[in-house]
Amino acid sequence: RSSDLEYLCNKFRPSVIILVHVLGHSNNMKEIMRLCKKYKIYLVEDTCEALGSKYNSGNLGTFGLASSFSFYYGHHISTIEGGMACSNDKNFSKIMTSVRSHGWLRDFNNSEKKKIMKKNNISEFQSKFSFFYSGFNIRSTELNAFLGISQIKKIKKITKIRNRNFNVYKKELSDFFLVRCKTKILSSFGYATLIKNRDKVYKNFLKKKIECRPVISGNIAQQLFWKKNNKKTNLPNADIIHKYGIYLPNHANQTVEDTK
């Protein structure tokens, strides 16, 4: 709820909000953008599961300072591994370009390099192995790029199929699962719901060779890496998802018959 988010904004005064569009569903972007403007907060969108989804007339991933997308093989499109990051802020985009490649300036043009070198008093010789940002080696390859560019052209078709499959699930399982969706155009990643007898349902799905999973990480504070290093956190709604959440598969190659 927006009131909960505003409470957190008031209490912690964050500089950045990282917003996850879970399984393709949009958040209330109008209200979130209002709060970001009011409290002068940068918005970063995790759009890894929502490529193609829209809120009103805007694509998810285009509202904040930056957004991330995953092209892992199980996602909307695949480059085998990797993904993309987007931003309409030129300076931030340049920083991301550097961070992707160790923090070097090797992907910058000559005038940009000289400007940064002069500002930081770095000689041309030193610049060949100077790390201007704390970076990573997460550069993509021509093969990954070719796969991504060829598939991004199909995203409207992929979105249409995934949305169709979601609606088939919704109709066929209406007596069992209640799912509300307010996303204008939904590029569904999976069909998620809450079930009290989740383990029993999971075993039945396995017998029928139907894959299903927990709703991503559930409550992140229940994950071992967090529990070992942080104080106990009270997140009752996330606990419910952690305990009862489950989602069924959705894919562009999944037919209506497969879904039923």
Please report, for each region that a protein language model flagged, where it lies by residue:
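Conserved active-site segment immediately N-terminal to the catalytic lysine
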Residues: E45-T79, K94, S127-S130
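Adenylate-forming
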Residues: S78-G83, G148
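Ser/Thr-centric signal marking residues that sit
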Residues: T62, S87, T255
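PLP-dependent aminotransferase class I/II
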Residues: E6-N10, V16-V20, H25-R34, K38, ...
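Short beta-strand-to-turn element immediately C-terminal to the catalytic PLP-Schiff-base lysine
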Residues: F69-S70, G83-D89, I116-K119
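Conserved short alpha-helical interface segments
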Residues: H21, V44-E45
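Proline-centered loop/turn at the N-terminus of a beta-strand
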Residues: S15-V16, K40-Y42, N59, A66, ...
